A protein has these predicted regions:
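Long, low-complexity, polar and repeat-rich extracellular regions
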Residues: 1-247
Length: 247
């Protein structure tokens, strides 16, 4: 098995025009770092029982493909602080049984998805955007934190047996079915804290819509309404704040 100690660094204005594959039991005791104006045009794939400690996209770096970790392989963390419009343009998929921590303050163009038995921790902060939404279809537990000024588009979907905990002070968009949070699985979803925002032009609340066959297993602990510019009539009906859950 191949073993590499140290980081793989793509820096300045260097470009990697193909996929990066860590496979066949290879071990990278360090990380893949894309920094400066570095660009990686292909995908990053960790497969075949291989491992790498981390993937970092920083500076004005751009990764144009997706990041995939296959079953029995290992990636501990992904950090995206890139200020480029591209950021990481593809999806991030963890099929493994190894916990993955994702920290984003830049742009992730695709979906973040966990399909395996591993836990996943997602922190979206400092104006970060996750355009493709978040999906948990495996058995690993997922923790999602979306900070003020940050955005998750296309909703949060649970279709496995995992426990998912959500804390949201930012913006979470709706999926194609109009749901903010969907539970179609046998797992549970706990909304630990959620700030409901107000449309500054209309005064309407951005209602949290909970849907899916398992919506009865979505529990809300704390919900706060940002009342700046709110039409007070909106506050008369709890369904303007959150709908689809037992109240």
């Amino acid at each position: 098995n191949t073993k590499l100690e140290g980081n793989i660094i793509n820096a300045d204005s260097a470009s990697i025009g193909s996929d990066i594959k860590i496979e066949d039991g290879a071990k990278v005791e360090g990380g893949l770092v894309n920094q400066g104006n570095g660009s990686i045009s292909g995908s990053v794939q960790v497969s075949g029982g291989s491992s790498i400690d981390s993937i970092t996209n920083t500076g004005n770096g751009a990764i144009s493909g997706s990041i995939t970790v296959d079953k029995d392989s290992k990636l501990d963390s992904i950090t995206n602080t890139s200020t480029s419009d591209t950021g990481i343009s593809g999806s991030i998929t963890n099929n493994s049984d190894n916990k993955l921590e994702i920290s984003n303050s830049g742009n992730i163009g695709g979906k973040i998805e966990s399909t395996g038995s591993a836990d996943m921790v997602i922190s979206n902060s400092n104006g970060g955007t996750i355009s493709g939404g978040i999906s948990s279809s495996g058995s690993g537990n997922t923790s999602i934190s979306n900070s003020q000024g940050s955005t998750i588009n296309n909703g949060i979907t649970v279709s496995g047996s995992a426990q998912v905990e959500i804390s949201n002070q930012g913006s979470v968009g709706k999926d194609e079915n109009g749901n903010t949070v969907t539970n179609n699985g046998s797992g549970s979803v706990g909304i630990k804290d959620w700030v409901v925002s107000t449309d500054k032009d209309t005064g309407k609340l951005d209602t949290v819509v909970v849907g899916g066959s398992g919506k009865d297993n979505v529990k809300v602990e704390n919900i706060t309404v940002d009342q700046s510019n709110v039409d007070l009539d909106e506050l008369d009906n709890i369904n303007h704040i959150i709908s689809g859950v037992n109240q």
